[in-house]
Structures are given as C-alpha cells and as structure tokens.
Amino acid sequence: MKAAFARYRLDFINPAGTSRGVLYKKDTYFLKICDEQCPERFGIGECALFKGLSAEDNDGYEDKLRELCHNISQGVDTDLSAHSSILFGLESAILDFSNGCRRVCYDNGFATGDYHIPINGLVWMGTKDEMIARIDEKVNAGFGVIKLKIGAIDFEQELAMIRHLRTRYTDKDLTIRLDANGGFTPDNVGERLKRLSEYAIHSIEQPIKPGQWEAMAKVCEESPIPVALDEELIGITNPMMMMSLLRSIRPHYIVLKPSLMGGFSGSTDWLKMAAQFNIGGWITSALESNVGLNALAQWVAMLQPRIPQGLGTGALYSNNIDSPLEQKEDYLWSNPEKMWHLPEFEWINVD
C-alpha cells in the first residue's frame, strides 16, 4: 500500500462568525491510499484540522501526516490517539478503498440516495438584523430546527433577537437550538440561561468554556435549558477519562464531531458510554469539505437518527469539492445522478 497527502484551502462564501472570531477561510488536508500496482484507484479521506479548536493544532501536523504515509508504505501502525482529524481521514480512506474507491465509506441507503438525513439549519453570528434575515431564509427553505450561534455580540441584543423570533415562530413552528461556544462565564451563566429559557429553547451547547468540570456539572444540574457538551469532549480519548467526564458532569446531550473526537471509532465509544447514563446526542460536522461530510453522513445514516443532525455545512464554501451531496429542505441526501469531481490536488508523496 502507498499513501500521500495534499493541502487544500476552503474559502467561505460569507464570513462565518463565532464567539472565537470570524472565519474567512479554512485549511484542510486530504489523505489517499492506493495499491502501488494501481495508483489511479484510491481511497480518499479528509483530515479536517480545525485551527484554533483541534487539540492537534500545532506545527507538527504535517510531520504526523508524513509519518503516517511512510508507515503505511512500510506496513507499520501509527499512533493517532492525539490526532483525531488524521484518524478520521485514515478511517475514511481505508473504508473508501475497501468499498471499491467509489467515495463510499459505508455502503448503505444514504450512499445510494435512498435515505435522507434530517438536519438543522445553522445560523452564524452577526448583527441582530443579519441573524433574523438568515433565520427567515432558513425557515423559508424548509428548516424546522434552527441552530443559532450566540455569545459574540451583546447578550441583550441576542436575547432581543430570540424574543423577536418567538413572536414570529412558536415552538411548534420552529425548534431553536443554541450554541454558546463557551461564551458565558460561571458567574453569569445561571442568569442568562434563566432568561433564555423563557423562549422554549431545545438545548444549549457548551454554555461555559471547557475544562471546568465542577462548574459545568452545576450548570447541567440547575439549568432550565438542557445542556449539550461539545468542546468539552475535544482531546479526550482515554476511555477512563471519557467515562469520568460523563459521570461527573451528567450533561443532557453530547454533540459529536468525529474529526475532533477520535474519528468514527472514538465517537462510537462516546455514544456507547453516553447511553449508559441515558445521555442523548447528535452528530455535527467540523466544517469539513464535501469529502469529509460525505463520509460523516454515511456513518450517521447507520445510526438511523430520529432528530436533526448538524450536517448542513456543505454550502459554506465557494470552492467546495463537487459531489452528489445535496440539501433538500431540511434533509441531506446523496443524489445518485451526480458525480464526484475531485480537483487536481498536489499530492505530497512520502517514501
């Protein structure tokens, strides 16, 4: 077997605002594996490094990719316990190769176009008027569940926006999920959650910054809004630590991003452990291109989700990879009449 990797820069169509700043571009990597005797047929996976959020965001990232590619050619295993995004890319590439190099990681109803995955509509941070306009656009497109990024602008403005939203859409018309990205503090989180709870909020992700287990446990116990852990899970791959976190904090939900949380294998472990505590959850993308989103969606389809997932990010980029993926109202599906068109990547081969 032989492996190579390539860099690729994704450009946002519109700046994406979060509590950590505004995103204009995102660098990602692709990994391919092939048989040396037939290099034109290869499995591909996306190593979706998330700068500023991934635990593996450091200067040694490409060195790890080189090590992996070299080890694959030598038939040697590579320790990827601290590199979730590379593990996600490797798992995807191996699965794709095993399924005939057809961009199929899991050969199920989603891959054939027969199964559609329910998704929420993501609304990025902006001014009150900008966010209301984006929400209206999502509702008009058919979304029944909206996820709002909050925590970047003045809280009173955000509250006014949600209040205004509820005057137009009841909780029967529209389900609202919130994602604070750790934007609140232990001192103000209780009062803010109480005020937000007046507007029939489904859940709020990561209300305070990760790493404050005792404070987060208190939030989960006292919050009038169900709390979901997101960033709290990043970088934790030891099974004992995973179990300890869930037992200590007892969130209502976990939100899994396989690129950041141990790939498919690690995320499966999180789901199994969460089930032991009756903790629910859903899956979201980590701003992957269509290559990563496709692999992720095929995996999610195996779970047969009953609630909307966070997989609606394929339309964010002006230079995304042409693929069969399409959004149809509030569903993601794979159109069997469309083909993959990979760009001419500049593959970096490692001996």
Region locations from a protein language model:
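N-terminal capping/lid subdomain adjacent to the active-site entrance of alpha/beta enzymes
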Residues: 1-176, 181-183, 197, 322-351
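Short, solvent-exposed coil/turn elements at secondary-structure transition points
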Residues: 9-11, 125, 233, 287, ...
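A short pocket-lining beta-strand/turn micro-motif at the edge of beta-sheets
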Residues: 69-76, 252, 277-283, 305-307
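Short glycine/serine- and small hydrophobic-enriched flexible loop segments
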Residues: 96-100, 275, 298-301
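Active-site donor-binding loop signature of nucleotide-sugar glycosyltransferases
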Residues: 47, 206, 311
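Structural signal for conserved beta-strand scaffold positions within catalytic alpha/beta enzyme cores
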Residues: 121, 255, 310-311
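C-terminal alpha-helical cap/extension of soluble enzyme domains
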Residues: 286-351
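Catalytic core of soluble alpha/beta enzymes
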Residues: 153-294, 298, 317-328
